[in-house]
Amino acid sequence: MRESGILMPVSSLPGPYGIGCFGKEAFEFVDFLVQAGQKIWQILPLSPTGYGDSPYQSCSAFAGNPYFIDLDTLKEEGLLTAAQLKAEKWGTDPKEVDYGTLYVSRFKVLRTAYAAWRKQCAGLYGCAYYFPDDYYAFTLANEEWLDDYALYMALKAANGMKNWVEWDKPYRLRDRKALAAFAAENEEEIGFWKFVQYKFAAQWQAVKAYANKKDVQILGDIPIYVSADSVDAWVGGALFELDADGGFARVAGCPPDYFSADGQLWGNPLYNWEYHKKTGYAWWVRRVRHALGIYDLLRIDHFRGFDTYWAIPADSTTARTGKWENGPGMELFDALEAALGKLPIIAEDLGELFPSVRKLLADSTFPGMKVLQFAFSGGDSEYLPHNHVKNSVVYPGTHDNTTLTDWWENGASEKEKAAAAAYLHLTGVKPTAKELAAIRTDDVRIALLRAALGSVADRAIIPMYDWLGLGAEAHLNTPGKLGGNWAWRAADGFAAKALAKTIHDECSVYCRV
């Protein structure tokens, strides 16, 4: 069945509190998707943002982002007042997330809400340590990760938010007596972090249930690696490659290529795949099971890393010293499928791929990705629409690409422009510089959107900013750039009925409605 969807990060929704969240704007966006004939809402990872404000560098592979909790809902529950919300600063530009300001204001009001909730519970149950049944149900269902997460965040707060490798040895090495003593002395702080996850889960499940009721599926995203500064790394131990001192032996990255002479040094700890194999990939089963409770479909980032991955000594300053190692391959996905059933996974298979990676993708039967911005650099590219396959997902660009408008005006080379113009019938087959200069940017944008929708690929996902025709201001992420990413927010009223009709009509032409 041919269908289409829209890539729209939760953080990019409009709203009064500095960042998109699970409030009325999320429900209104689902309504917009329905009006536009869309079946998929693709979002970025819902994990807490970490280094560089990235959702791909999170403090937890299981926790949700506290920033997404809707504060108006907490106000309706009697946990916050309008005056308390009005007193805080949420940023100066409603079209951009100010993560620095948000870090201060969000946690301040969430702590206020937590104190009010504790007081509310004490009044209801006559005891300061009795809580609602759904809270106990949530903590019990998620105890495998929640207890460690809450303890980790409390320890992090007590240590000035430093990386756990800088904590005192008893905490760093998880000495039982030291952790038990800390937990006893910091019950309220640990409770705060559980409360945050409790509210996150309740609100997100309400949004997801509403979307599913409207026949809209949520396409989520899980990074292959965890952050070095995370509860997963702190607790994981044998899950990762460790040296004799218990530190990380090697870290993740990419080898040198045309774009980077030194390669990319990501710094994420690498998995000890031999250990995972011995456990039947139990941690991965837990992780994917948890993700399937949050999302309907899963995009797995850096899929090629399950076949072969670049391993770099932890003390290296560049990725040049790394080498290729073999990943778990189909054995991992067979274990996941045996435990969880058929997996609704989309593989991020972009970039140069070894034949073995292509074989893994074929053996898994997961759909891969086709990105049109990569199609026009020369030759018979696999990303050109005539080379697409049915079992794939086509995108004009991903969150790591700029917008179509900015790509044409500032990103594409003259060679790419000429190839795209000819392919999209915007000029003759050999356009002159004058002919290229005469092309309207919006004509290119619409032609690329139609090329994506017209692809044989089963699914077409269009970023919201490309439907809106936005430029560089909406560029979500520039790989390798630290700071200034993940900030774009849509303007109030962006999800207009007229735009929904345009999207519906365009998708109807290509039988995606």
Annotate each PLM feature.
Residues 34, 204-212, 337, 361-362:
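Surface-exposed amphipathic alpha-helices with a cationic face
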Residues 24-49, 293-295, 452:
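Catalytic domains of carbohydrate-active enzymes, especially glycoside hydrolases
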Residues 193-226:
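Conserved, well-ordered alpha-helix/loop/beta-strand core segments that scaffold catalytic motifs
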